[in-house]
Amino acid sequence: SRGLGDVYKRQVTTNMEKKISISQIKEVAQEAYNEVKGSTGGKNADYIPYLANIDSKLFGLSICLMNGQTINIGDTDYRFGIESVSKVHTAILILRQYGAQKVLDMIGADATGLPFNSIIAILLENDHPSTPLVNAGAISACSMVQPVGNSDKKWDAIVQNVTELCGSAPQLIDELYKSETATNFNNRSIAWLLKNYNRIYDNPDMALDLYTRQCSLGITAQQLGIAAGTIANNGVNPVTKQTVFEASLAPKITSMISTVGFYEHSGDWMYTAGIPAKSGVGGGVMAVLPGVMGVSAFAPPLDEAGNSVKAQSAIKFIMNKLGLGVFNGDNVTITE
């Protein structure tokens, strides 16, 4: 039995220790980019005119390590609409302002199993909007942003929070904001239905406008990678070294992302990629590997669930090639 114990000990030690060099990560990231770049699957979001006209060949991939080093390949300086990835940022903001339990009580953390803009989900679970990472919960989250009743100061808080997470300021894409405002009929219905169930905590039209504006922020893949890195680094921005939020909130937001980051495809994503990730119809995806790295990718063509085809493929390639994932049980060390 002693021999078996030694074998078990060696196996546990092997499973828990994994060293990966920065050069390996760079090499695999470049492989992923080259592998995916020529893909022609998916199509731009066509229900928002601005997004429909973005160059579908744009593609960028960015990785932020815990030492602050970033790896950037392709169109990582192109500003695209952050769209639903902004839901993660505002979820973090209300977690900072209210604490984890209050957010759970007022919004929730459950996946709906339905499309991100579902009205039916509200009717089925009218006691709470389910999660800040679908449209109903995100609009509710915007209504919670302090100070309640002051749109300008709420907006300042939203932008400041994004700036701290990314290490640099986003820019509002005015054309996208106007395009979204002119076509957000479904979200207007959601906002007022939430009001009917007392699940919105400020003026519904104000909350909807804030949500529409935050989705219209222009951000780069590099900025998004740093934001993912900040979550992975337990709330400390790896580049600026600023403590953006308490470490205790990091697993809360990561659990939300893993549960519903890819909406009704979230289970398939976690099964095949093994890394919590959040998508947006602007083509961006941010992924968080706690304690190791933040990864982001951007490419406009989407699958039927509204997730970037190239971004998914690239991130999945990196995780699988490096043998990384939140469920692997490895203690990963990045070496020079």
What name fits each language-model region?
Residues 67-68, 81-104, 227, 295:
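Active-site SXXK
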Residues 233-336:
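Structured C-terminal helix/loop/strand segments within mature extracytoplasmic catalytic/sensor domains
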Residues 181-184, 192-252, 303-308:
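Penicillin-binding protein/beta-lactamase superfamily catalytic region
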Residues 51-54, 130-131, 182, 274-278:
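Short Gly/Pro-enriched turn/cap motifs at secondary-structure boundaries
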Residues 1-8:
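Short, small-residue-biased leader/transition segments that mark boundaries at the very start
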Residues 15-25, 38, 45-55, 81-89:
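Non-catalytic interaction/Regulatory regions outside core domains
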Residues 17-41, 94-214:
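Active-site-adjacent helix/loop patches that line small-molecule binding or acyl-intermediate pockets
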Residues 37-73, 286-287:
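A short, well-structured edge-of-sheet supersecondary motif
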